[in-house]
Amino acid sequence: MEGVQTMFAKFIDVIQTFLTEPAILIGILVGVGYALDKKTPIKIITGMISAMVGLMMVLFGGFQFSATFKPVAEAVSKAYGVHGYLMDSYAMKAATQIALGDNFGYVGYVFVLAFFTNLLLVLFGRYTGAKGIFLTGNTGVSHSQAVLWLIVFWLGFGWVQSIVIAGVLTGVFWAFSTTLIVKPIAKVTNNAGFTIAHNQMLGLWFFSKFAHKFGDPEKHDAENLKLPGWLAIFNHNVTAIAIVMTLFVGGFQLATGIDNVQLMAKGKPWYIYIINLGLQFSMYMVILLQGVRMMVGEINGSFKGWQDRFIPNAIPAVDVAALLPFSPNAATLGFVFCTFGTIFSMGILLLIHSPIMVLPGFVPLFFSGGPIGVLANRMGGYRSVIICTFLLGIIQTFGTVWAIPLTRLAKEGVGWTGIFDWATLWPAICELLKFIASTFHLGPYSI
């Protein structure tokens, strides 16, 4: 019996390994899709590699954005002596891993069950309406461990029951949240053939409902602003991003004092360090743009095979960074005003002496503000970007304040992801779990 359990555990590990390597997974799906469509071996191989390299460029560019800005945010917090719970995906990963302790290994079972639940719902899409297949493996693992912890804490069931409930719940969330935004994403990307799998699917859907009310996407497009005189330099995407990010990030850094900036510069003149940061942000956006072009081209060409032979409704759901190059100026503007909305909300928390203070990481600011800025621009122009992303910063901040006590992770002193879906829907689900637990004397309410 132990041998069978060991083999099953190894089988789950192998599946999880493939599912958590998004580039390899996309490559396999593209290759099989081309094979099903009876393409030549050369096309199958070149398509697989192009898709894998493209997605790796998207992930690399996204990671570098985070890695570049993280020390800046930490320096600002330290300089002003502001302490609190971190709004960041990595904070949620760390906190839930600590909470699960020695049982963290069960997360793999939840993740695999969630993926196959998602796949099953799409397979029967004629009846369920589900279309999106969640392919962002690293984010999927983060979801799996968070949901497993919430189920274990609030319901207090055994591990088998908790794994099943968490896996099915996560898979249902993936299937329908990715499907919910198929039409808005198609509009933003000019029918590129994918949807989004990350932490702000409901956020994209929510803002798509009213982003068009704040302007004309043709007249007020952030990518086609007709600026007079020397301001025309901002009509060039690469230049605009470099200058805006140099001023924005540089302003944050200089607010901590030139001596602190010089320490971060590690031997370089502080002003050269700030200029380089702005140029790096622009470079990472160019990398993202090229990666998205490569990946989307192959996904469009290959998924016809899958749709014709097996899953007619299937739409691949990929990392949210894939949206950014569709409107780079709007992505930058969205990041800036999401940050302003977050700072505004933190000011309110300080004024009312909130017992919970949250500090934003880079991920909820850029990878929520940026994509929602892109969507808002395509629907209502730059004025919509400003309004929607400022509101986004407020929602994410106060939603995280709502979520932290409900997750019962506050004692770990780490934080919560803070991104839209996990600052709105999941705290509401926690309230429901809390009600069930108190009604039936489960989990923390058990006698």
Predicted segment positions?
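Membrane-interfacial helix-loop connectors
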Residues: 136-155, 339-401
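Helix-loop-helix junctions within the multi-pass membrane cores of secondary transporters/permeases
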Residues: 28, 45, 72-95, 208-212, ...
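Mid-membrane cores of alpha-helical transmembrane segments in multi-pass membrane proteins
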Residues: 80-91, 109-117, 136-144, 167-171, ...
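Signature of multi-pass transmembrane helix bundles
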Residues: 2-61, 105, 109-301, 310-320, ...
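Membrane helical hairpin/interfacial module
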Residues: 51-107
